[in-house]
Amino acid sequence: MPLEFEKPILELERRIAELKETAKATGVDLEAEIRLLEERLARLRKETYENLTPWQRVQLARASGRPTTLDVLEKAFQDFIELHGDRAFADDPAIVGGLAYLEGEKVVVVGHQKGRDTKENLQRNFGMPHPEGYRKAMRLMDLADRFGYPFLTFVDTPGAYPGVSAEERGQAWVIAQSIQRMSRLRVPAVTVILGEGGSGGALAIAVANRVLILENAWYSVISPESCAAILWRDAKEAPKAAEALKLTAKDLLQLKVVDAIVPEPEGGAHKDPDRAIRNIKEALLKALEELKGLSPEALYEDRYRRFRSLGAFAEP
């Protein structure tokens, strides 16, 4: 389903396609008209995608077709072996993880996983993990620490599942445990925010030495809709909330919440997922190279300093 701000672009694309079909069917030379429209389309695309509002970027971050964790694992990694279950209650499909190779190096990978359609989203709980998902992630953190493998995570969740069943099984406590466990890793840890980075559900697997974010992804303590419902008593004020939350990649880089922005193809990662995944792989390799050679103690201290330096402080 097209986004509202993309409709003028889609209309021009439709008109160009119609002219090409007409020229092919009738033999009439419409090359000049087509070229003019294509030039106009290029300008419109550039103007639109270079001046996106925070709310428009949130919409792009949620677009169907963006690369998921499993997409990245399939195309950027080799020999991925998925591990299931938390060895306590169940397996949570909203979080996937396991062992893989990245350019010949053994790594442990964990990430949120959304579905492509309604059926798969129901199975994956729309990427909202239960406590057993975070326990599975911690199991993999321990595995990475034990064998000295780099620990890589991919974030794409509106937040941890807030249902009664999750609360009964200790959702808040498990998120806190996961944050603590990841902060104590003695191996290189790198996080990539693929789409949505919603609150503690995202942070639970994002306490890394390097945090990267895709150009149109977002990362915040709360979703714009929820923030608007609380502050303005109306979820329709989400665009205003998105502006106030400073949740875009550019804002987060300025605030030093993230360390680098991974560029997306024009129009968003869903327009050319393969190219987006190549960019992700390149950014991951660069981040790992920066951490290469650091001792376990130095990696721990690097991560500690990174998170202690976040925020703004005013002396009384």
Swiss-Prot record:
GO terms for biological process: fatty acid biosynthetic process; malonyl-CoA biosynthetic process. It is an enzyme of class 2 (transferase). It catalyses: N(6)-carboxybiotinyl-L-lysyl-[protein] + acetyl-CoA = N(6)-biotinyl-L-lysyl-[protein] + malonyl-CoA. Its main location: cytoplasm. It is found in: Cytoplasm. One of its GO terms (cellular component) is acetyl-CoA carboxylase complex. Keywords: ATP-binding, Cytoplasm, Fatty acid biosynthesis, Fatty acid metabolism, Lipid biosynthesis, Lipid metabolism, Nucleotide-binding, Transferase. Residues 36-290 form the CoA carboxyltransferase C-terminal domain. PROSITE patterns: COA_CT_CTER (PS50989). GO terms for molecular function: acetyl-CoA carboxylase activity; ATP binding; carboxyl- or carbamoyltransferase activity. InterPro entries: Acetyl_CoA_COase_a_su (IPR001095), ClpP/crotonase-like_dom_sf (IPR029045), COA_CT_C (IPR011763). PANTHER family: ACETYL-COENZYME A CARBOXYLASE CARBOXYL TRANSFERASE SUBUNIT ALPHA (PTHR42853), ACETYL-COENZYME A CARBOXYLASE CARBOXYL TRANSFERASE SUBUNIT ALPHA, CHLOROPLASTIC (PTHR42853:SF3). Acetyl-CoA carboxylase is a heterohexamer composed of biotin carboxyl carrier protein (AccB), biotin carboxylase (AccC) and two subunits each of ACCase subunit alpha (AccA) and ACCase subunit beta (AccD). Component of the acetyl coenzyme A carboxylase (ACC) complex. First, biotin carboxylase catalyzes the carboxylation of biotin on its carrier protein (BCCP) and then the CO(2) group is transferred by the carboxyltransferase to acetyl-CoA to form malonyl-CoA. Belongs to the AccA family. This is Acetyl-coenzyme A carboxylase carboxyl transferase subunit alpha. It comes from Thermus thermophilus (strain ATCC 27634 / DSM 579 / HB8).
